[in-house]
Each structure stands twice: as C-alpha cells, then as structure tokens.
Amino acid sequence: MGQADISRPVNPDGVEEIGQPTADLGMVMDCVEAGDITPPTKRKSKFSGFGKIFKPWKWRKKKSDKFKETSEVLERKISMRKPREELVKRGLLLEDSEQGGEDPGKLSHATLKNGHTTLIGSTRSSSPVQVEEESERIASLRKPVPEEEPKKRLGSSGSQPHSEAEFVPESIPKQPLLPPKRHLSSSHEANEGQAKDATSSGSLARPSSSASTTAITTAPAATMAATNPAKTVHSSGPPSQAPRTLPAAPASTHTTATLSLTHTGPAKQPPIPPPKPTHRNSNPVIAELSQAINSGTLLSKPSPPLPPKRGIPSALVPTSESAAATTATKAPSDQREKSACSVGSEPLLTPSSSPLPAHIPPEPPQSPPFPAKTFQVVPEIEFPPSLDLPQEIPQQESQKREVPKRMLDHSFGEPQVPPRLPPVPLHIRIQQALTSPLPVTPPLEGSHRAHSLLFENSDNFSEDSSTLGRTRSLPITIEMLKVPDDEEEEEQSHIFAFDEDVASTSVIPKLPQCLQEEEEGKESDSDSEGPIQYRDEEDEDESHHSALANKVKRKDTLAMKLNHKPSEPEMNMNSWPRKSKEEWNEIRHQIGNTLIRRLSQRPTPEELEQRNILQPKNEADRQAEKREIKRRLTRKLSQRPTVAELLARKILRFNEYVEVTDAHDYDRRADKPWTKLTPADKAAIRKELNEFKSSEMEVHEDSKHFTRYHRP
C-alpha cells in the first residue's frame, strides 16, 4: 500500500545520495507505465504509506527498550554489509553497463510481492541488509522479534485480504525479489531482517550507505538469469492462459522464486502459517476462465483465483504458465503418473493460478490420504506449526495420486463415462447432487459453468469431510466454521468417515417421468448409487451444513414427498374411517337437529319488515302504499268542520282570533337581574310594588277588608 512513498528511482551509476528525500509519486508511476503494460487500475495516494511508518496511536504502547533492541540489531547488521565491488566479484551483482543494457520494459514492470505491487529497482531503502552472511542472519533470526513487528505486519497486510493467498506472510511488501542462490530458510530470515529494517529505519531515520544499491541490481540479475530455464520448463506444463496476459518478465520472476524455493531443502525451516481462505474474495469470472482451460475431466483442480482488488493492477494475476512450470520442475515423473491416472486428459492437479505452489500447507499427519486440492475451507487450527515443507510436498503428491486412482478403479462396478456429455439443466444437477455423495458433473459450457462452482464435483469435499469429521450431504463448500469441540471428535471420526459413506446402503427415489428419461442416458461415475440416507449423525451435524445445502435438501425432500403422494381415489377411500350405517344415520340426525334448531331461531320475514330490515317486495307495491296513505289523509282533512261550524256548536267561544305580534326572542335564562340584586334593592322593589297595589289596583268590595292597603 505504501511502497510508492518509500521507494526511490533507479540510479544507473549505483551511487546513492544519502540525504535525498523520498521520490514523489509521479516518477514512480512513470516508471510503471514505461512498458507496454496496462496501467494499474487504481493509483495510490501520496500519503498512503505514512500510516505504515508514523503510527502515533501505537507509540504510546511501545517502550524505549524495544527501540534500543531494534537499533542495536540495525547497527550490527549495517556494520557487517559488504561493499559493492565485493558483491560484483562474487557474482551477486551485475555491472552497471549490463544493468543499463537490459530491457527497460522488464525493469520497470511492477513485480508481485505478498500481493502488493513494487518496482523491481525501486525498493532501495527497505533492503540495506539483504546481502550478508547466512550464519549472521540465522543468529539474528533466533533473537526474539519485538512485538511491534506483528502489529506493523497486521497494518500492512490486513488491509488487503487478497494478499493472503501468497504463502509468505512473514515478508512485508517492501522487500525485493530474492536471488535464486539462496536457501528457503535464509530467504525467510532475510525477509524478517528486512521487515525489522524497514520498520525501524522509517522511525529512526538512519542514513544508508552505498552498498544498499545491491538490492537494486540483484533482482534484475535474478530475473534475467532465470528467464531461459523458466522458458525451457514451460513446455512441459499444459499450455493455458490467465485471465489477463502478462509480459515474460513477471512470469519468469515468479518461476525463479518458486524454483529456488522448491529445489533447496535446508535443515532448518521457519514454521509456515497456513493460508487464510481466499474463498470469500474469489472472482467467479476468473475462476470460470481458468477452469475452462485447465479442467478437462472431473478430477482436474479448480483454480483458486486471485481477483484484482484495490491498488493492485489487474495484470498482476500470475500466469498459469509459470505455475505449470513450477509443477513441471517439481516432479516430471509425477506428472506422467498423474496423467496416466486421469481419464485421457491433462495432468490431474495443475494449479492454474496459485503463485507459489511450493508453499502448499502441510496436512495433519494423522489424516488418511485424500487429495489436498482445496485449502480454502480448512481452518487455521488444523496445521501443526513445525512441519517441514520438502518432506511434505512428495507426501502430498503421492496422496493426490492415490485417491483418484482408487476412485477410478473401485467405482463399484459402474461403467466408465466418456468425458464429454451434453450440458445438464440446473435442477437435474441439484437432483444428482442430492442423490449421490460424489455428484456427476459433465463438462460444462456457457452459463452452466457458473453453477458448477457451487455444485463442484471435486474430491476436495472428501478431504473436508474427513478432516472435519462429518459426513457429506452436498459438495457445496461455503467455508464451514470450525468449532473447538470438533478437534476432539475429528481424531476418532475422520478415520472411518469415508468408509462409512462408501458402504452406506441407499434407496433410489422415484423420479418424475421427465427426469427419468434424462437419467437413463447418464450413469453416475461417483462411488455411490443412490441418495444420501438422512441419518441420525446428520441430524446432529445439521448446524454445520450451509444454508444453501439445507435449502436444496428441503426442496428436494418436498419433491420426493410429492412424487410419492397417493392418488385421489386412494385418498377418498382412506380419508374417513369406516363406520356402520347406523352410526352414519345417527351422525346425520344430530347434524339435522342442530340445523333445525338454528333455523327456528331466525326471525320471520314479517318481523323483519316490521323492523324495516326487510324491504317490501318491489317498487310498485311501495308506491301503491304511499298513494293509499295520502288519499286517507286528504279525506280526513276534507272532512274538518269550518270555524263557523265550530262557533255554532259553541266549541269556539270567541268571535275573533288572537292577534299575534312579532317580538324579538331573548334568552330568559341568561337575563336574570334579580340574582344580582342586593337585599336593599329587593326591599325597595317590594315597597314600590306594594305602593302600586295600594294606590292603583282595584279590589272587589267584598274582599277589601282582607287587604292591608284598603282599610275602610
């Protein structure tokens, strides 16, 4: 991520100015674009590398003794560096004229280191200790590495998960490619030394001397020296092409690196941590392209693809040519045996795009020999940390040869299938995946190849199921999680898990008619003949299966149940339990009584009409009723007596009607003045009223003596 900030342009004289600041971004990008390569997809920012060197949030946690220890290691290493002339004499460096005469396109091409891009000649400040005595390097490696190194390494590699597929996680992405003369352990130790140097030289700002230009020239020398043997080796591997083609230089650099890593097996090796799964980042398009070329039969290995991501140029996916070259150099006789095993096609296990095949992680020694094709699913806990690579690689190849032979020979008497079959629809492939533990997948064309990545007919699932100690239902490997409890079970159960699958009796489900006709043309070349029995062990292990496998299993179980569904006459016969005629009559009588009782509680239509719930029959009847009511009313009104008749009958006693005058209405309740009167006001009103009565009201003579006011 931050190589562009630490790197410097190649100095053709080999003379390094000590006080020179770091090269700006433009010069580095111009060097990258000098050849006829596709430019990188995403340019790095100018300050992206500062986080690697200056981490003030980490400085709190560091202690001064770690700084002292690192500076002592640095001083000791810098004091023991060889001058440039001695390195040229020993043949580790080229002369300036030879270096200048090389192809500028090859020099300027960005090489792949630990999943990052760096220029071959631009990693100068990070490698002051690259060429030194191997004994001193071993001695410095045995010293305890300070704790700041893993933190820095986490900071650099944790941001790019696709770099984990390169199997050297100790190396920080700043070191150049190692010369091919070196042993494997020494290259690892040099990587660790460089990691120390790079981290502390950024923080301590140590001036470099002229011998640090050795790193610049060793990498092109290694590149050009190993191009010819790599090209001769290429012819033995099967020709294939990667998703994007590369110039010859990066391919040959990969080949030299892997050649040097493969052939030399020293006594001591640092432990190689297993690769983290690249499965979740895998680009299905690249996987399809590489699978179309490399896998001719059902036993050839699908490629673990490295998708171009973030700052990596897309041209950095390494060619399968170089990978094939490494496998060819590893064991040509192995290639012949493997090609004899496979059904008339390319060699069995040709990794199409894994960049360093020498770093295949070792299997646990107690596991039975199954082909170690996919290491994506196997979790980290499985690998013992102290196994040596050179002993493990032949063992693995013998395992890879054993099982496909065993599978092909003992396929339980089934006829061998020719490799080319017509493409099969997805639902039939799901059916086949469910009816056989190792499913049939004919060679795929077109859009079916994407589905084949899910329903893959690989042997890897036999390895996964054996090492993880569980039986197989579907080979859809969607990265199962490893629970710590599984480790205890796995030693007992993985020994007989494979035999149990082979020997299990099975029932062939009845397929629909359309599927049966297609099934007759195809015979399964796997080692079982029927569906998986849903046993009790699988019920216990249901949590381990992926969601997709469970979904497909549910759907297929439902389809099988629907296939076995009885016909309608059978259902009609068996739906009711048989009863005698008397029982049937009794049941009918009870039902009839209940219905009659409920019907009798309903209101009659007359009641409903009276309640105006039920309307009369029709509109004509309704109109007739209205006319009748009107006629009756008019007759009554016409028969009323007049006022004269009423006066004559002395019913009306007045000769005139009461006259009515208009008056404004007012609210009597609101107008209550007497409520607001004081007692004095009330007494005054009463006195006034009494005076009016005594003076103006007339009283009958006979009753005058009853009044107070009218005394005689």
UniProtKB/Swiss-Prot annotation:
Where is the PTM Phosphothreonine found along the chain? Answer: T441
Per the UniProt record, one Pfam family is RPEL
Instruction: Enumerate composition-biased segments (Acidic residues).
Output: 516-528
One GO biological process term = neural crest cell migration
- Which SMART domains does the entry mention? RPEL
Polar residues compositional bias: what residue ranges? 114-124, 233-243
From the UniProt record, list the RPEL repeat ranges: 72-97, 593-618, 631-656
Repeat in keyword set: yes
Gene Ontology CC entries for this record: cytoplasm; lamellipodium
* Residues modified to Phosphoserine: 125, 127, 140, 156, 282, 303, 353, 436, 452, 462, 473, 524, 526, 567, 600, 638
Which domain of life does the protein's organism represent? Eukaryota
Q: Which InterPro entries match?
A: RPEL_repeat
UniProt-annotated stretches for the region Disordered = 1-22, 90-405, 507-557, 602-626
Role this protein plays: Regulator of protein phosphatase 1 (PP1) required for neural tube and optic fissure closure, and enteric neural crest cell (ENCCs) migration during development. Acts as an activator of PP1 by interacting with PPP1CA and preventing phosphorylation of PPP1CA at 'Thr-320'. During neural tube closure, localizes to the ventral neural tube and activates PP1, leading to down-regulate cell proliferation within cranial neural tissue and the neural retina.
Protein name according to UniProt: Phosphatase and actin regulator 4
